[in-house]
Amino acid sequence: MATIVPTLFSFVRDTYKGRFDVATFEREVGRDFDNQEIAQAISKYEQEAKNLRNKDEIRKVIQYIDLTTLNGDDTASKVVALAKRAINPVPTDPSIHCGSVCVYPQRIADVKKFLASSKLNSNITSVAGGFPSGQYHLKSKVLEVELSVADGATEIDIVISRASALDEDWKTVHDEVLACKKACGSAHLKTILATGELKTLSNVYRASWASILAGSDFIKTSTGKESVNATLEVAYVMCTAIKRWHELTGKKVGFKPAGGIKTVDEALSYVALVKDILGDEWLNPHLFRIGASSLLDDCLKGL
């Protein structure tokens, strides 16, 4: 550890100066994961989720949710209805709010207009930067981020280039995320790794690091459009990267699993994982979100 830490601090310093050294990146973040160790940990988290299940924890889960609609038939009335629900998800308790409402860029202005007219507040998340494929020119990705922020998005969810990741071109992955981060201005950046398309856990770890080094405020598992979305396996790897970053720099990066999380028990498994790897200080909406469209329904059944 004594020899690794100064090297990585130097790498972090140089990366933020725009010098991404590939050899140093590979030396510092290239690692393999023990599948048996991960499987044992996941079994523990799933059991702990059952023990966590109570009304207080369910209320906390609701506050982690980025309440999402990302469909081709989304209309102004549909996203406004979603925003109303995100602001007051539990009718009997107006103090509870979802983490944000998440919509396509074209619908940001609809949510913003509703919030202004009703004098209500909510974080507005928008997917941008070539969502969900990432197969766009960088200029168009950056422009979409800029337009989304101008329309009122307070949080931007971009997606990395899986093509670059699978080609092990981590410098390009990093540089594209960095360009989008700069375009965000004061908006928070959540970077989606689309882990279901990265093939290996080592790639997930490297993608996590490339995204963190580029200044991501959160790293997120999935777009929700892949054939395999959030899993506890990739969450374990991503949170391991976040933990290592915090150990070395003292800086905290958030974590967002998304895609296919529909039940309270599933959500609480991620809560148990984050609690174990990152600690209680991560269990708040500033550092932990869950991207979901139907999870709220199951939460309300449990209250």
UniProtKB/Swiss-Prot annotation:
One of its GO terms (molecular function) is deoxyribose-phosphate aldolase activity. The active site is at D157 (proton donor/acceptor), K220 (schiff-base intermediate with acetaldehyde), K256 (proton donor/acceptor). Its EC number is 4.1.2.4. The keyword Glycosyltransferase does not apply. Pfam families: DeoC. It catalyses: 2-deoxy-D-ribose 5-phosphate = D-glyceraldehyde 3-phosphate + acetaldehyde. Pathway: Carbohydrate degradation; 2-deoxy-D-ribose 1-phosphate degradation; D-glyceraldehyde 3-phosphate and acetaldehyde from 2-deoxy-alpha-D-ribose 1-phosphate: step 2/2. Gene3D superfamilies: Aldolase class I. It is an enzyme of class 4 (lyase). The keyword Hydrolase does not apply. Keywords: Lyase, Schiff base. Transmembrane segments: none annotated. CDD domains: DeoC. GO terms for biological process: carbohydrate catabolic process; deoxyribonucleotide catabolic process; deoxyribose phosphate catabolic process. One of its GO terms (cellular component) is cytoplasm. Catalyzes a reversible aldol reaction between acetaldehyde and D-glyceraldehyde 3-phosphate to generate 2-deoxy-D-ribose 5-phosphate. This is Putative deoxyribose-phosphate aldolase. It comes from Caenorhabditis elegans.
